[in-house]
From Swiss-Prot:
Composition skew (Basic and acidic residues), residue ranges: 79-90
Protein name stated in the entry: UPF0229 protein YeaH
InterPro entries per UniProt: UPF0229
Gene assigned in the entry: yeaH
Comp. bias intervals (Gly residues): 92-102
UniProt-annotated stretches for the region Disordered: 79-110
UniProt record similarity statement: Belongs to the UPF0229 family.
Domain of life: Bacteria
HAMAP family per record: UPF0229 (MF_01232)
Length: 427
């Protein structure tokens, strides 16, 4: 009997290669579908999988077919509407073709719905954050902060003699020799029993005894030819270098929770910060996040309180900037950390406080951070805070600001702020 052993690395997902090829081929259509779908999700459901739909015409495969020209004769059984040389037009109407449900009703016409398939959570997040990076990440400092330590990582079939594992190699040798000689040993045992019976019987069966002795000798020779150790048995201790946990960057999240921020505006701010958190945790291993909520007073909070606390009040934006400056001086030396900040507000601020925000950012924060992003979530006209920040944008290259009017703007603005083209290292 012949046995086939499937040694493919993705044996349990035999269509994985085809799936990955499909995702690469139609990446543009899939990313467009994802960017439309993310705005329809709830705040707590941003990181799950997604059903993606692609128009059928976008996934049509190239094919060989006869050209429209030339002379051809065909027989269509049961035809009573057309005669020779008539050209059959494609039916028009809402009955087929788009699958979008926007056409008019029709009694004829046919087509295909959009192609819909499910992508996993990992595929969804990979496509969601593709081509994004922390801007101005200081690569030379990142290498200084990253330390690698050697750790045992199982066994490997290749290696240097100094790393050979004698015990594991002998175990493999015993298993191989047992598997290769088990059948022969059973047959040898049966022949030896038959030989003992014949040798003790009367009259002696010399020819049969000679035949059995010959077969026994051949089986023993075959068993002895199985090598005690083979290169297939050898196993070496495997070692790999793993980065020693060390923080390389810190992100400050500053969210306005004043009374002027209605629930809809707060939800949009939370969506932005959830995207930011998923992006950081998905792309970078060692990034700390500092959460700061502010109204008239600022407070450093944990992740749960940042997203779910109901505390509110007036508006003094400078309180959050002062607290961030204090935390940086206390815990994050700019010479050793890549410092980032993302601020979200509706732009409503006490008028005399906006110039103070400009001063704190210009003199204390922007000189030490790698990148500072500000998003203003409002449908109203911009106020003094936006105008003060516009002066900063024209002066500092590491300051960016964007305007969000409604929920559909969140993901495009997020990609604009953290697009990989901006991720150039500073010397």
């Amino acid at each position: 009997m012949t046995w086939f052993i499937d040694r493919r690395l993705n044996g349990k997902n035999k269509s994985m290669v085809n799936r990955q090829r499909f995702l690469r081929r139609y990446k543009a259509q899939i990313k467009q579908s994802i960017s439309e779908a993310i705005n329809k999700r709830s705040v707590t459901d941003v990181d799950s999988g997604e059903s993606v739909s692609i128009p059928t015409e976008d996934i049509s495969e190239p094919m060989f077919h006869q050209g429209r020209g030339g002379l051809r004769h065909r027989v269509h059984p049961g035809n009573d509407h057309f005669v020779q040389n008539d050209r059959i037009e494609r039916p028009q109407g809402g009955g087929g073709g788009s699958g979008s449900g926007q056409g008019q009703a029709s009694q004829d016409g046919e087509g295909q719905d959009e192609f819909v398939f499910q992508i996993s959570k990992d595929e969804y997040l990979d496509l969601l954050f593709e081509d994004l990076a922390l801007p101005n990440l200081k690569q030379n400092q990142q290498r200084q902060l990253t330390e690698y330590k050697t750790h045992r990582a199982g066994y490997t079939a290749n290696g240097v003699p100094a790393n050979i594992s004698v015990v594991r190699s002998l175990q493999n040798s015993l298993a191989r020799r047992t598997a290769m000689t088990a059948g022969k040993r059973r047959e040898l045992h049966a022949l030896e029993e038959n030989l003992a019976i014949i040798s003790n019987s009367e009259p002696a069966q010399l020819l049969e005894e000679e035949r059995l002795r010959k077969e026994i000798a051949e089986l023993r020779a075959k068993i002895e030819r199985v090598p005690f150790i083979d290169t297939f048995d050898l196993r070496y201790k495997n070692y790999e270098k793993r980065p020693d946990p060390s923080s390389q960057a810190v992100m400050f999240c500053l969210m306005d929770v004043s009374g002027s921020m209605d629930q809809s505006t707060k939800d949009m701010a939370k969506r932005f910060y959830i995207l930011l958190y998923l992006f950081l945790s998905r792309t970078y291993k060692n990034v700390e996040v500092v959460y700061i909520r502010h109204h008239t007073q600022a407070k450093e909070v944990d992740e749960h309180e940042f997203f779910y606390s109901q505390e509110t009040g007036g508006t003094i934006v400078s309180s959050a900037l002062k607290l961030m400056d204090e935390v940086v001086k206390e815990r994050y030396n700019p010479a050793q950390w890549n410092i980032y900040a993302a601020q979200a507000s509706d732009g409503d601020n006490w008028a005399d406080d906006s110039p103070l925000c400009h001063e704190i950012l210009a003199k204390k924060i922007l000189p030490v951070v790698r990148y500072y992003s500000y998003i203003e979530i409002t449908r109203r006209a911009h106020q003094t805070l936006w105008r003060e920040y516009e002066h900063l944008q024209s002066t500092f290259d590491n300051f960016a600001m964007q305007h969000i009017r409604d929920q559909d703007d969140i993901y495009p603005v997020f990609r604009e702020l953290f697009h990989k083209q901006n991720a150039t290292a500073k010397d």
